[in-house]
Curated annotation (Swiss-Prot):
One of its GO terms (cellular component) is cytosol. GO terms for molecular function: ATP binding; glutamate-tRNA ligase activity; tRNA binding; zinc ion binding. A motif ('KMSKS' region) lies at residues 237-241. The keyword Acetylation does not apply. It is found in: Cytoplasm. One of its GO terms (biological process) is glutamyl-tRNA aminoacylation. Binds 1 zinc ion per subunit. It comes from Escherichia coli O157:H7. Keywords: Aminoacyl-tRNA synthetase, ATP-binding, Cytoplasm, Ligase, Metal-binding, Nucleotide-binding, Protein biosynthesis, Zinc. Zn(2+) binds at residues 98, 100, 125, 127. Its cofactor is Zn(2+). The lineage of its organism: Bacteria, Pseudomonadati, Pseudomonadota, Gammaproteobacteria, Enterobacterales. This is Glutamate--tRNA ligase.
Amino acid sequence: MKIKTRFAPSPTGYLHVGGARTALYSWLFARNHGGEFVLRIEDTDLERSTPEAIEAIMDGMNWLSLEWDEGPYFQTKRFDRYNAVIDQMLEEGTAYKCYCSKERLEALREEQMAKGEKPRYDGRCRHSHEHHADDEPCVVRFANPQEGSVVFDDQIRGPIEFSNQELDDLIIRRTDGSPTYNFCVVVDDWDMEITHVIRGEDHINNTPRQINILKALKAPVPVYAHVSMINGDDGKKLSKRHGAVSVMQYRDDGYLPEALLNYLVRLGWSHGDQEIFTREEMIKYFTLNAVSKSASAFNTDKLLWLNHHYINALPPEYVATHLQWHIEQENIDTRNGPQLADLVKLLGERCKTLKEMAQSCRYFYEDFAEFDADAAKKHLRPVARQPLEVVRDKLAAITDWTAENVHHAIQATADELEVGMGKVGMPLRVAVTGAGQSPALDVTVHAIGKTRSIERINKALAFIAERENQQ
């Protein structure tokens, strides 16, 4: 049997972390078994579904490289198929027309609730022989079995059973002729030959209804697996304040897709004590029986730790392709300065996100208008004039511009003046970067370049002279 899974989001908003994890688990299961992964857009909610949301979902999937083998399919383009199946069910007696008014249904609901009963349709039209005009408004209901129970072996939670007496005859076609969500899902899974349905636990109550419809259609019933919800680290339902933002927001905030995927796969699944997984390892090791039944806690600090790891572990040339977007957002012209891959090597240890990296690299490519006030006050003082002049001349004398030779020039300056490295290094750092912090000074000066570094040292010396004149 060929394994076939699907990810079926409703395009009423962005792709959030919960949806992304469900997509990842479905994708991994299919890939682990050499199967196929289908993308289906469940857009039957015409009022809330938007083209922007569809684009956002597909952007998120593409950024995470969760490529699909079929689709995207759109439910709104399959209404003829759904209605044909409903008409077939009406002929076979597994569905029936219901003419009950909204007023009657509301009164029935209030009566049942007053008695402490679960609100459900009482089946009045199921056995009715009343004659109705062809154009009289009606819905179509599924004739749910009235005896027995529905049992399915959830691959994460184990056997789950529902009594058919708890399930009423759900509406499968509205008065306007449009099919309902639960019915469309069934026909889609049937037509697309889905073998395994991996989805959130909020769909558990839909499962017995969908199984009963499949059985009425004499269609194969897929295997179900319901993934637990994601909470914040405070144990409460995940919300925006916990980080429940769109997948693309993580891109915008400077996270690598590898970091988010690694974090999401571990958010409810484990393989021994292993924390870091390549995409190939995820595919190799992923199984549904290793997915936890318990809710997971989203921890932004852990995600940030993973992102920092991947910034330094992945090839700099690859990280640079993602950094490029953030550089563009900062409007930095990188034509005159180090290659982005070299920048990744320079700033990788200091920066935990690509956004942070982009925001802290401008001095490598563009001259700064002024020095950081605190750093200049502390380090660009008259006592720094001589160390800066000496190191400038030694840097100017370098014929082979390497980080090693830059280091020798700084060290030689300290030795010649008989001062500690800090007496040379700190004024030099402020002079060439404009700030009091940077990566290792020798590689920083090397990356900034010989001509630009000397020009900036001269600018710092002029700043010191002007400061002296003002005193």
